[in-house]
């Protein structure tokens, strides 16, 4: 906040209590005039009384003179009436009528109101004057003045304290900005954060320059953190994780789940399918030497042999083949003559 704004606030706070104290006072018109007529020495218009067109304002306890502005005959009489309609006589005391003036001694707050003067010659006419009295006595007025004075004092102290705090804040902010432009490296970013807390008081030019420098330093800090993260040593397995996973998938090929399901369903059916196949008796014997040496076997009729066949998967077939090869290596064939004898015995 600028200094002249603070001064305006101080002026407003200074004059508001005064206006509240004088709230019963009506501003006078532009045609204010003072009556220089010759009054009695004891009823001269006091310094606390003011006169306007038809309004007279006086403080409580002062003497007031009201003038009737009607043209009065030399032998005519003027009659004065108060706001209650009671005629005021000049028999001494508080009221005193002299020619066309009404003099009031020690005006009280109850004397306020409209006063009317009436003449009967040369013509009947009337003229009214309003009297307003400023209430200055009593406990309430003193209490009100004390309250206003205390409020004004507190407000003034708060405003002065605020000005001092703002001045201190501005000095600290200026010092922080100067230190920001003098520092380099990581400390400059820290100074930028300190200045950011005081942003509302910074001028526009310095704010723009500070924003540019802060943005550049923030990006530089981000790059520094990124390089620092890359320089941290990590295990080779974590660094080569993607290559390791790709090699693993190439080594172990995963089939389609749908095809695997179909194969699992077909496997029991293949295992269950078994049948008896008849060998054609017209098939000739093999061209083995053993067959040619056996002349009697050519004249014999063929016989049907029942063979049970089962279907296995490729992997099972390979395992069976391996087992049969192993057994053939460890069990050599028997004597040909004994083999032929057993054949004839079965026939």
Swiss-Prot record:
This is Microfibril-associated glycoprotein 3. One of its GO terms (cellular component) is plasma membrane. The gene is Mfap3. The keyword DNA damage does not apply. Residues 23-139 are extracellular. Residues 47-130 form the Ig-like C2-type domain. Keywords: Cell membrane, Disulfide bond, Glycoprotein, Immunoglobulin domain, Membrane, Signal, Transmembrane, Transmembrane helix. Disulfide bonds join 68-117. Residues 311-331 have a biased composition (Polar residues). Residues 1-22 form the signal peptide. Pfam families: Ig_3. Glycans are attached at residues 31, 36, 63, 103. Component of the elastin-associated microfibrils. The keyword Phosphoprotein does not apply. Glycosylated. It is found in: Cell membrane. Its main location: membrane. It comes from Rattus norvegicus.
């Amino acid at each position: 906040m600028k200094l002249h704004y603070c001064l305006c606030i101080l002026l407003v706070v200074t004059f508001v209590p005064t206006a509240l104290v004088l709230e019963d006072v009506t501003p006078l018109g532009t045609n204010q005039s003072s009556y220089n007529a010759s009054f009695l020495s004891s009823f001269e218009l006091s310094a606390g009384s003011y006169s306007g067109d038809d309004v007279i304002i006086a403080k409580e306890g002062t003497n007031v003179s009201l003038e009737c502005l009607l043209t009065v005959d030399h032998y005519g009489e003027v009659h004065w009436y108060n706001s209650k309609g009671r005629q005021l006589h000049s028999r001494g005391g508080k009221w005193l009528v002299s020619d066309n003036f009404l003099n009031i001694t020690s005006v009280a707050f109850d004397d306020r109101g409209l006063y009317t003067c009436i003449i009967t010659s040369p013509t009947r006419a009337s003229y009214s004057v309003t009297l307003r009295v400023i209430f200055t006595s009593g406990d309430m007025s003193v209490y009100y003045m004390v309250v206003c004075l205390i409020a004004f004092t507190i407000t003034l102290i708060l405003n002065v304290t605020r000005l001092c705090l703002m001045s201190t804040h501005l000095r600290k902010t200026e010092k922080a900005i100067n230190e920001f432009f003098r520092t380099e490296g990581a400390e400059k970013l820290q100074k930028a954060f300190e200045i950011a807390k005081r942003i509302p008081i910074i001028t526009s030019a310095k704010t723009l320059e500070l924003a540019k420098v802060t943005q550049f330093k923030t990006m530089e800090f981000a790059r520094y953190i990124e390089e620092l993260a890359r320089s941290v040593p990590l295990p080779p397995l974590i660094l080569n994780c993607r290559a390791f996973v790709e090699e693993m998938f190439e080594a172990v090929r995963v089939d389609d789940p749908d095809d695997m399901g179909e194969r699992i369903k077909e496997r029991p059916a293949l295992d269950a399918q078994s049948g008896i196949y008849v060998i054609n008796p017209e098939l000739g014997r093999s061209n083995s030497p053993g067959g040619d040496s056996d002349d009697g076997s050519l004249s014999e009729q063929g016989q049907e042999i029942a063979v049970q066949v089962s279907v296995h998967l490729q992997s099972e077939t390979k395992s069976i083949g391996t087992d049969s090869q192993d057994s053939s290596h460890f069990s050599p064939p028997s004597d040909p003559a004994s083999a032929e004898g057993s054949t004839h015995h079965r026939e």
